[in-house]
């Protein structure tokens, strides 16, 4: 009688242990996937959105610099200048927000953006002096040469920054999919062992 009882209880206990182990692994894997999903949503996507705002404001700023050249009258110049100051303030805010999430993989692209942004501000200050002293020929030359080059470099730096963020998000997504595949494989193996 004891041997029949043992023959029945050992497989039942083994199945119970496998079921408990499978449940624990499933919970741990689900938690890992959830954490990775939260990381993607709260960090990478927010950062990509922030880079988008930074890009949009930077493009508006570069367009406004050209508007400053053709602004006629003190009121029009003041309006454009106020808009430029507002955009610079926005960009500074976006840069501070971005710096909060910056990691070592993004530092090169961000450093490049900051460098070209600084060059743009320097070139714009010169342009502003030319316009304010009615040196329209010099202002036009600067705008059509140096400022164009800096704006193109700035746009390229923003593209690199965006690509860096998208690559980081893609990497995180691949990690999440790998965790999901591992969870499915582990669950499948445990199921086969339990049935077998």
What does each model-found stretch correspond to?
Residues 8, 12-61, 74, 102-117, ...:
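Amphipathic alpha-helical segments and their boundaries
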Residues 27-44, 62-69, 94, 98, ...:
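Juxtamembrane amphipathic/coiled-coil helical coupling segments that flank
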């Amino acid at each position: 009688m004891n041997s029949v009882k043992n023959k029945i209880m050992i497989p039942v206990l083994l199945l119970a242990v496998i079921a408990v182990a499978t449940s624990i692994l499933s919970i741990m894997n689900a938690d890992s996937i959830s954490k990775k999903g939260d990381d993607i949503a709260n960090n990478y996507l927010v950062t990509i959105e922030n880079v988008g705002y930074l890009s949009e404001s930077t493009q508006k700023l570069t367009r406004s610099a050209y508007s400053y050249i053709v602004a006629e009258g003190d009121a029009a110049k003041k309006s454009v200048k106020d808009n430029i100051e507002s955009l610079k303030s926005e960009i500074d805010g976006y840069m501070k927000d971005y710096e909060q999430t910056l990691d070592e993989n993004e530092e090169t692209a961000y450093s490049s953006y900051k460098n070209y942004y600084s060059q743009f501000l320097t070139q714009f200050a010169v342009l502003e002096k030319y316009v304010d002293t009615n040196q329209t020929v010099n202002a036009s030359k600067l705008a059509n040469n140096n400022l164009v080059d800096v704006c193109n470099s700035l746009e390229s730096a923003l593209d690199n920054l965006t690509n860096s963020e998208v690559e980081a998000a893609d990497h995180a997504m691949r990690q999440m999919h790998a965790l999901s595949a591992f969870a499915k494989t582990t669950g499948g193996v445990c199921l086969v062992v339990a049935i077998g």
